Amino acid sequence: MAGRSGDRDEDLLKAVRLIKILYQSNPPPSPEGTRQARRNRRRRWRARQRQIHSIGERILSTYLGRSEEPVPLQLPPLERLNLNCSEDCGASGTQGVGSPQISVESPTVLESGTEEQC
């Protein structure tokens, strides 16, 4: 359908406005009073913030139709993963730099009791 993405944007803006109003309705507690009074006010404020957060999540899921739980990330089988350090192994300053590599050829990661060093 043509023009439906604009409706989706409007729904998102409406949801964000509602959530903003909720957060603005709960200002931080005042720093006046005894230590116990301040602690109680902060505790109640944090409880209200948690409620607002859960309400905001429900608003977003209702307006945007998102699922409650995130979609699990699909990972390759553990047998196919190995460390590949054939390029510049041990060069100073480059450890942890670059993209992780997945090698499909070698199903053996490490033999029991052996360590491979480059």
Swiss-Prot record:
* GO terms, biological process: mRNA transport; viral process
Tell me the residues on which Phosphoserine occurs: 5, 92, 99
Where is it mostly found? Answer: host cell
Q: Write out the biased-composition intervals (Polar residues).
A: 92-112
The Basic residues compositionally biased stretches are 36-49
Where does motif Nuclear export signal and binding to XPO1 map?
A: 73-84
This entry's Gene Ontology molecular function terms read:
DNA-binding transcription factor activity; RNA binding
Chain spans, region Disordered: 23-49, 89-118
UniProt subcellular location: Host nucleus, Host nucleolus; Host cytoplasm
Modifications the protein undergoes after translation, according to the UniProt entry: Asymmetrically arginine dimethylated at one site by host PRMT6. Methylation impairs the RNA-binding activity and export of viral RNA from the nucleus to the cytoplasm. Phosphorylated by protein kinase CK2. Presence of, and maybe binding to the N-terminus of the regulatory beta subunit of CK2 is necessary for CK2-mediated Rev's phosphorylation.
Cellular compartments per GO CC: host cell cytoplasm; host cell nucleolus
Q: Where is this motif: Nuclear localization signal and RNA-binding (RRE)?
A: 34-50
Locate the region Homomultimerization: 18-26
Fetch the InterPro entries from UniProt. Answer: REV_protein
Please give the record's comment on domains: The RNA-binding motif binds to the RRE, a 240 bp stem-and-loop structure present in incompletely spliced viral pre-mRNAs. This region also contains the NLS which mediates nuclear localization via KPNB1 binding and, when the N-terminal sequence is present, nucleolar targeting. These overlapping functions prevent Rev bound to RRE from undesirable return to the nucleus. When Rev binds the RRE, the NLS becomes masked while the NES remains accessible. The leucine-rich NES mediates binding to human XPO1.
The text of the family note is: Belongs to the HIV-1 REV protein family.
Q: What else is known?
A: HIV-1 lineages are divided in three main groups, M (for Major), O (for Outlier), and N (for New, or Non-M, Non-O). The vast majority of strains found worldwide belong to the group M. Group O seems to be endemic to and largely confined to Cameroon and neighboring countries in West Central Africa, where these viruses represent a small minority of HIV-1 strains. The group N is represented by a limited number of isolates from Cameroonian persons. The group M is further subdivided in 9 clades or subtypes (A to D, F to H, J and K).
Per the entry, what this protein does is: Escorts unspliced or incompletely spliced viral pre-mRNAs (late transcripts) out of the nucleus of infected cells. These pre-mRNAs carry a recognition sequence called Rev responsive element (RRE) located in the env gene, that is not present in fully spliced viral mRNAs (early transcripts). This function is essential since most viral proteins are translated from unspliced or partially spliced pre-mRNAs which cannot exit the nucleus by the pathway used by fully processed cellular mRNAs. Rev itself is translated from a fully spliced mRNA that readily exits the nucleus.
Subunit info here reads: Homomultimer; when bound to the RRE. Multimeric assembly is essential for activity and may involve XPO1. Binds to human KPNB1, XPO1, TNPO1, RANBP5 and IPO7. Interacts with the viral Integrase. Interacts with human KHDRBS1. Interacts with human NAP1; this interaction decreases Rev multimerization and stimulates its activity. Interacts with human DEAD-box helicases DDX3 and DDX24; these interactions may serve for viral RNA export to the cytoplasm and packaging, respectively.
User: Per its record, how is this protein called by name?
Assistant: Protein Rev
Gene behind this protein: rev
